[in-house]
Amino acid sequence: MFLQYYLNEQGDRVYTLKKFDPMGQQTCSAHPARFSPDDKYSRHRITIKKRFKVLMTQQPRPVL
């Protein structure tokens, strides 16, 4: 069994071990993807993130 989550009405994550939420929708995995040092596709992911401007270096500085 793996930890799963679904979003409630307020948009908050609700963690569960079940595969379906109370509304019958499938839950999402709460675990991140595995890391591999032999990642063959990292260059492509970075290119896509640059293209759509979602890299952390392309975000505005947070206001402190």
From Swiss-Prot:
Recorded GO MF terms: box H/ACA snoRNA binding; RNA binding; telomerase RNA binding
GO cellular component: box H/ACA scaRNP complex; box H/ACA snoRNP complex; box H/ACA telomerase RNP complex; nuclear body; nucleoplasm; sno(s)RNA-containing ribonucleoprotein complex; telomerase holoenzyme complex
Localization in the cell: Nucleus, Nucleolus; Nucleus, Cajal body
Keyword Ribonucleoprotein: yes
Keyword Transmembrane annotated: no
Alphabetized UniProt keyword annotations: Cataract, Deafness, Disease variant, Dyskeratosis congenita, Nucleus, Ribonucleoprotein, Ribosome biogenesis, rRNA processing
A GO BP annotation: telomerase RNA localization to Cajal body
Cross-referenced InterPro entries: H/ACA_rnp_Nop10 (IPR007264), H/ACA_rnp_Nop10_sf (IPR036756)
Primary location: nucleus
Effect of residue 16 to M: In CHINE2; likely pathogenic; decreased rRNA pseudouridine synthesis in peripheral blood cells from a homozygous patient; reduced protein abundance in homozygous patient cells; no effect on interaction with DKC1
Family affiliation: Belongs to the NOP10 family.
Biological function: Required for ribosome biogenesis and telomere maintenance. Part of the H/ACA small nucleolar ribonucleoprotein (H/ACA snoRNP) complex, which catalyzes pseudouridylation of rRNA. This involves the isomerization of uridine such that the ribose is subsequently attached to C5, instead of the normal N1. Each rRNA can contain up to 100 pseudouridine ('psi') residues, which may serve to stabilize the conformation of rRNAs. May also be required for correct processing or intranuclear trafficking of TERC, the RNA component of the telomerase reverse transcriptase (TERT) holoenzyme.
Subunit and partners: Part of the H/ACA small nucleolar ribonucleoprotein (H/ACA snoRNP) complex, which contains NHP2/NOLA2, GAR1/NOLA1, NOP10/NOLA3, and DKC1/NOLA4, which is presumed to be the catalytic subunit. The complex contains a stable core formed by binding of one or two NOP10-DKC1 heterodimers to NHP2; GAR1 subsequently binds to this core via DKC1. The complex binds a box H/ACA small nucleolar RNA (snoRNA), which may target the specific site of modification within the RNA substrate. During assembly, the complex contains NAF1 instead of GAR1/NOLA1.
Disease: Dyskeratosis congenita, autosomal recessive, 1: A rare multisystem disorder caused by defective telomere maintenance. It is characterized by progressive bone marrow failure, and the clinical triad of reticulated skin hyperpigmentation, nail dystrophy, and mucosal leukoplakia. Common but variable features include premature graying, aplastic anemia, low platelets, osteoporosis, pulmonary fibrosis, and liver fibrosis among others. Early mortality is often associated with bone marrow failure, infections, fatal pulmonary complications, or malignancy. Cataracts, hearing impairment, nephrotic syndrome, and enterocolitis 2: An autosomal recessive disorder characterized by infantile onset of steroid-resistant nephrotic syndrome, cataracts, sensorineural deafness, and enterocolitis. It results in death in early childhood.
Protein name in the entry: H/ACA ribonucleoprotein complex subunit 3
